[in-house]
């Protein structure tokens, strides 16, 4: 982001309210946001501004911002309708204290925020994952103030999108893309070493039909870490929260379902070391967590 960016209290509130132009009770929402910012204080606002300027400049890890996280959780109180929940919380007990890569389908720019909020609401086991969540994010996440602000609710690692799903890397030659991808993977392994839980969207891009697309083979590179576990997750509902082609948020009932964790070593053995086969197994595990009309390539 530009080094000239600076949002004071009123400018930050105004920017957040643009997400919500089609909501009811705007005065109540504004008051809730203002109270959260005032409670955090000027130093927290200054920290947020510093992170907005610095985040996304290179292919590396960026830390979360506590104020951005709290503000999004207040917004979630208004956006997520009754029935929005995390299913399969019991599976989280198996990954406590272990390196884990959560692999999910992808419907919306709001998917990672949904996962973070639902985990934070899911008792001690959920909070333990939410508090160490780091999301693998493509360049578009850092391309606008709105998306960048949303990305500060958790750690992120900027990564180039696969050439199979993106034209964004056209200005980079193949060697540059490979170097950037290597930096991102190294950063991810460092975060796993430090105890983070990685969240990766297996298809590499949002589905425009809500049906699953074939997963990307390159995702297996995140599994190349000692004793790592793979946790499949299925998301529904967010395609209506932040529809493709629209800027505003819509209230929705959204659900994330967690499946049984898979030891990456066992996944590798089951696939005979074939990385494409590994990701098709993971894709099928995600599809099992989704309604039939979301399964697409893994029906």
Question: Where is each model-derived feature located?
Answer:
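Surface-exposed cleft-lining segments at the edges of enzyme active sites
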Residues: 165-180, 208-209
């Amino acid at each position: 982001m530009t080094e000239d960016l600076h949002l004071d209290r009123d400018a930050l509130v105004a920017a957040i309210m643009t997400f919500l132009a089609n909501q009811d009770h705007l005065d109540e929402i504004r008051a809730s946001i203002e109270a959260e910012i005032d409670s955090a204080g000027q130093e927290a606002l200054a920290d947020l501004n510093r992170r907005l300027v610095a985040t996304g400049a290179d292919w590396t890890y960026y830390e979360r911002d506590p104020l951005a996280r709290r503000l999004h959780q207040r917004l979630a109180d208004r956006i997520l309708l009754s029935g929005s929940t995390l299913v399969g919380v019991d599976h989280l007990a198996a990954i406590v204290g272990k390196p884990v890569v959560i692999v999910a389908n992808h419907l919306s720019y709001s998917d990672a925020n949904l996962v973070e909020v639902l985990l934070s609401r899911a008792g001690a086991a959920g909070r333990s994952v939410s508090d160490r969540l780091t999301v693998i994010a493509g360049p578009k996440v850092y391309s606008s103030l709105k998306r960048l602000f949303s990305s500060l609710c958790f750690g992120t690692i900027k990564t180039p999108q696969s050439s199979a799903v993106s034209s964004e890397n056209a200005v980079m030659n193949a060697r540059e893309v490979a170097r950037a991808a290597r930096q991102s993977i190294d950063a991810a392994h460092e975060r796993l070493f430090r105890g983070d839980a990685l969240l990766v969207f297996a298809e590499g891009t949002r589905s425009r039909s809500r049906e699953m697309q074939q997963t990307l083979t390159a995702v297996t590179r995140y599994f190349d870490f000692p004793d790592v576990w793979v946790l499949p997750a299925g998301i529904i509902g967010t395609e209506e929260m932040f529809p493709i082609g629209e800027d505003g948020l819509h209230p929705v009932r959204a659900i994330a379902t967690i499946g049984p964790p898979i030891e990456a070593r066992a996944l590798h053995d089951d696939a005979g070391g074939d990385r494409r086969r590994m990701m098709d197994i993971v894709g099928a595990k995600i599809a099992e967590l989704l309604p039939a009309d979301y399964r697409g390539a893994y029906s």
